[in-house]
Every structure is written in structure tokens, then in C-alpha cells.
Design a protein with these regions (language model features):
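Outer-envelope beta-barrel architecture signal
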Residues: 1, 96, 107-109, 184, ...
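Outer-membrane beta-barrel and related beta-rich outer-membrane complex signature
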Residues: 10-30, 120-150, 222-229
Length: 253
């Protein structure tokens, strides 16, 4: 058995003078600013759902506010929700990564496992735009996730999923903490079980060694219970990481 653990940190320390004055905007909230990690994002802070008219009346002026709509936090306290109510909300750098190799033998059997994990990492779960927001990407042939069945409504007032709406009047697809989730995971990257056929039997078949094995890749994923997607390693629209099963034979003559 052997394992490893590693960690790294990154921070932008210098930019061209013409860029450093304002930072660079890479789209989707990504900004390059001295003193902050590369790939970090700014955005709005989602502060729950408006569940009563009193909550709306007592909140800062927010365009699109309504029952069942996401409430944005008034960070500067000026009583109006605008672009100044943004802060750093996302850092793609994990706290640490780790791995564990295990090899076991018992009589003619052997077992190999490789576990790999990432801890303390943020992910942007863009798929929530399809699982939580009916307006989503507004593409007619796309299905919606089953989470929309639990959306806020007068008969489901305890839900934290926005009310169904065809129009995104509250701009709920904006970059915000609503889409930032815990992307920590532990994966069984490789599992192999082997059997060495007894040598006297192998020699009867004119072989020095005969081994049969069954292996699987990406067999198991352990993730945070707070992650709403399928795979925190692939939280958006990428092709799913496949499960591979292989049966093989090793022969020596």
C-alpha cells in the first residue's frame, strides 16, 4: 500500500500596467486581478428565496424580485441591487489532492485498487440552469432535470429552488453563489481482480503462466451530499466520464 498527497496555491502577482489598473475580464465572471488566483470568479451572493411579500418589501430594491425568486444580497448596503453587489465567490484551486494504491494477494488471487480524490474545491454547476430554472437556456429540445418538480410554489413554500417561470425577469442565470458547489470527490479509478491458474494446470496446456483478470475504471464516485449534479469532476456540459470494464488473459510460454 502506498499513497500521496499534494497541494498548491496560485496567485497573480503581476500584469501589464494597462491591464493591472482594471483587471482583465474573461467572461462568465472570470477576472484576472493581482493578488487573486487565476481562474477565480466574481458574482452575486444568492441569499435564499423570497417566500413572502413582506420579505420583498423589506429587501433592497431588486429588479425582478417576486415570490419564489432568488434574493440577491445587498453587499454595499445602499438599498439597491446592482453590479456593485458582487464579490469573489469562486476559487478553482483545491485544498489538496490525494491518491492511494492498494495491492493484495491471497493464494492465487490478487487485487489492485487505485483511489484518487480532490478535497476542498469549488465547482460551477452550470447544469443547475437546466435542473433548477425552467427558463434555462431556452432551447426547445432540451429536457429539464427532476429538481424543477420541487420548485417553490404557494403549495411548496419550503423549497429553495426558484419558482417555475418561462421568463428570467430576475436574471437568475447570472454568475452567483447559487451555482457554486462543493466539488470534492473520491473516485475508485481502477479496480482489478486477478486469478493465477495453478502452474501444473497451465503446463498441461503448454504454458508457463496463465492469469485471468477483470478490471474496471471509474467504478465508484463518492461526492459531497451538497453537490446537486452527477459528477463533480465534470459538473457542466462535457461528455460523461465512462465506466470501462475489461476482461483479459495474461499468458507466458
Amino acid at each position: 500500500m502506498n499513497g500521496n498527497i499534494s497541494a498548491y496555491r496560485n496567485k497573480i502577482t503581476a500584469l501589464p500596467a494597462t491591464v493591472a489598473a482594471n483587471g482583465t475580464f474573461g467572461g462568465n465572471g472570470v477576472e484576472s486581478v493581482i493578488g487573486h488566483p487565476n481562474g477565480a470568479q466574481v458574482g452575486y451572493v444568492a441569499d435564499g428565496i423570497f417566500k413572502s411579500q413582506a420579505e420583498i418589501d423589506n429587501h433592497a430594491t431588486q429588479e425582478g424580485a417576486g415570490l419564489g425568486r432568488i434574493r440577491w444580497r445587498d453587499l454595499d448596503g445602499n438599498g439597491v441591487i446592482n453590479e456593485k453587489d458582487q464579490q469573489w465567490i469562486y476559487d478553482p484551486t483545491p485544498a489538496f489532492s490525494y491518491g492511494l494504491n492498494i495491492y493484495l494477494e491471497y493464494k492465487n488471487f490478487d487485487l489492485t485498487m487505485f483511489w484518487q480524490g480532490v478535497q476542498g474545491v469549488d465547482v460551477i454547476s452550470d447544469l443547475k440552469k437546466e435542473t433548477d430554472l425552467w427558463s434555462g437556456l431556452n432551447i426547445g429540445f432540451l429536457n429539464k432535470g427532476k429538481r424543477v418538480l420541487d420548485a417553490w410554489s404557494p403549495t411548496n413554500p419550503d423549497s429553495d429552488i426558484p419558482a417555475l417561470s418561462r421568463d428570467d425577469v430576475n436574471n437568475e442565470k447570472r454568475v452567483s453563489t447559487y451555482f457554486v458547489e462543493n466539488g470534492s470527490f473520491l473516485k475508485l479509478r481502477n479496480l482489478q481482480i486477478g486469478y493465477n491458474v495453478p502452474q501444473n494446470f497451465a503446463k498441461k496446456m503448454k504454458m508457463e503462466r496463465l492469469r485471468l483478470y477483470l478490471s474496471a475504471q471509474n467504478l465508484l464516485t463518492i461526492k459531497s451530499k451538497d453537490f446537486t449534479g452527477v459528477d463533480p469532476e465534470n459538473p457542466n456540459y462535457g461528455y460523461p466520464i465512462p465506466l470501462n470494464l475489461t476482461f483479459g488473459i495474461n499468458v507466458s510460454f
